[in-house]
Amino acid sequence: MANAFADSGWSVTVVSLADSSWEIENGTDQSLLVGLNTAIERVPVNLRREDFEPIIGRWTPLHARNPDRWKAQFLKRTTREFPEKIFGAWRTPLIEAVSAVYRTKPADLLIVSPAPYTTLAVAEALHRQFSIPYVVDYRDGWSVDVVNGGSAFDVGSKQDRIEREVLKNASAAWFVNERIMEFYKDRYPESSTKFSVVRNGYDSSAVAQITPHIPAGSPLSFGYLGTMNLALPQLRNLLEGWRLARESVPGLKDARLEFRGHVGAGYASGAGGHARLISEFSDCGVSYGGPVAKSDVAAVYSQWNALVLALIGGEYVTSGKVYEYMATGLPILSVHERHHAACDVLNGYPLWALAEPSSPESVAAGFTEISQVAHRFDQDSLKKALEHANSFEYKRSMSGVLDEANAIAQAPVALPSHTSSEQVLLQPYQDVEIPAKPVVTLIAAQKIIATTLEKNIPLLLAAGCEVRLITFHDPHSALNGIDLALQRLTLQAFKRGRSKATRVIKRNVLAPFSSLIMKVLKLPRRVDLLICMDPTLDEWIATTDVFVALDRYAAYAARNCSKRSGQAVAILGMREITRLVTSSTQQG
C-alpha cells in the first residue's frame, strides 16, 4: 500500500516497530525492503513485547520463578490504558511517537492498520489534537470474532464504545472482505456509508518468477507456506490425514509434505508445540524447513507440485495467503471449514479441492483428490488457473483506494526533497554483549524438539562456540520422542572435533524427598534446585559465558546460574543465541 501511494505522488511516512522489536518475535526479512519506493520515509519505534524479552537478566524475579503467574499479571496490567491484551500498554508511547512525527512533518491523511487495535487510539488522538483526517484499514476486524464467528465483545462494552467513536470520526474504513464489512454495517449503522472493501491480494513481484514443474513419475511434493496458527487438534487431523492418504493411495507413495514459514514466536519459534507435533510425523515424509525470505518465495513454490492451504476460522477469515497460492497456478488443497471466506476467492479456481478439518479421514480424502489433480497437471490447466488468479493482483484494488484517499485529503503533498530512515523514536534497545566464541550452556526443563538442536547447534559450533546441554530428557531419546524419568539429570557436551559424550548423574541424595519436591516446588525452582545441588556442574557454571534457557521454565535456573557464575549472561531461546553469535561473527 505504501508503494502505491508513493508511486502516485504522495509523500509517505511509515511509522512501525524497530527491527529489534520484530527480531525477538518472528525475526526480520530485509529482502522485504527490496523494491520499496526510495521516497518512503521509515520511522522505527522502539517498543518491545515484554513477554518476549530474551535477556533473562532483565526479567523480574517473579517472571523467572513463576512464568505462568507473571504472564497472568502482565496481561492484566497491559489493559489498564487500552482494552487490548499485550498491546494496550503501548497506547501512550505510540500516540507520543506518531505525534512527534506529525509535528516534524504534518500530513494530509493518517492511515492506521489494526491489529493491534491500540492503533485506533492513535488515530483518535491525532484527529482530536491536529484535526487530521484518518482511515481505518482493518486487516482484522476488532468487534467481530473472525475465528469463531459472532461478536468478540458486547455492545456497550469499553471496546465497543471506543470503536464506535473511532468509526464515527473516521473519514473511511476499509475491510478485507464483504462478510466482515456487512458485520460492521449491522453493528455500526451510523457509520456504514464510510465502509468499503479493500481486499488483500498477491504481490506480482513475489511470484512472477515461479516456474511450476509437472510431475513425471517422481513422488509428489506438497507444501505449506505461511504463519502457522492452526489449533493443535486441527494440525493433528491434517497430519493424521496425510499419513492415512500416504499409506493407502498409490499416487502418494513416498510423497512428502513440507512446512515453511513461521511456526511459533519468540523463544518458541520453531520449537513450540506445533513444531513438536510436525516432528512426530517425520517418518511419513513430513518436515519443517523454517521461515522463507520474500526474495526466496518464488523458488520455494517452484519446488512443490501442490499447495496445502490450512486455515483457522470460517466465514470471516479470507487470509492473504490464498491470493499468493492462486498466483502460482499450482493445485491447491484447502483444509478449512466449508463456509470459509477463502472459498469466495477460490470458487472458480480450476485446480482446487476442499477438505474439512473435522477428521483425519476427511483430510485424507482431500489429499487423494488433489493428488489426482496434480498428476493431471499440464500447461493448459496452469493457464486456466492463472487466468482466475490474475484478477486478484493487489495493484488492481488500489486505484479505488487512491481515488478515495485523494478525495479525503483533497490533494497529496509534494514529494520531500530528501528522505531519512535514521529517526528513531523512544529509547533504542541495547543488545546484550557476548564474547567471541563463547562457552554456551543450554538448559531445558521440558522435552527438547529434535529440529531445534539439529538446526542451531551446528551453527554455534561453526562459529567456534563450545556448547553444553543440561536437560531432564536424554537428548538421544528426546530426538526419538522418548522421555527419561525425572530421577535422572542428563548432561551432554558438544565440542568441535569430538564425538558426543553423555554422563548420567544419579541424584540419590534427593530420592527420599523426590515426591515432596514434586508436590511443593514448581518446575522452574525444581530445575534450579537440582542443578544447584549437583556439585559436578560447578565447573560448567564457573566456565560458562552464556546460559540459554530452551524454554521459559528453565529461565529461573539460567538466571541463577548466571548469578553464580558472576560473569555469564542468561538469555531465552536457541534462536536468540544463534542470532547473537552469528551477528557477532559477522561483525568480527
Positions of predicted regions on the chain:
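A charged, aromatic-enriched C-terminal amphipathic alpha-helix characteristic of glycosyltransferases
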Residues: 358-364, 375-405
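Carbohydrate-associated surface elements
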Residues: 179, 201
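Membrane-proximal helix-turn-helix segments that form the acceptor-binding/catalytic region
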Residues: 85, 99, 118-121, 125-129, ...
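Acidic donor-binding loop of glycosyltransferase active sites
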Residues: 171, 283, 287, 299-316, ...
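Nucleotide-activated donor-binding/catalytic signature segment of Leloir-type glycosyltransferases, i.e.
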Residues: 249, 254, 258-263, 268-296, ...
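A conserved catalytic-core segment of Leloir-type glycosyltransferases
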Residues: 16-92, 477-525
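N-terminal subdomain of nucleotide-sugar transferases
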Residues: 1-50, 172, 189, 245, ...
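Conserved donor-binding/catalytic core segment of Leloir-type glycosyltransferases
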Residues: 214-233, 239-242
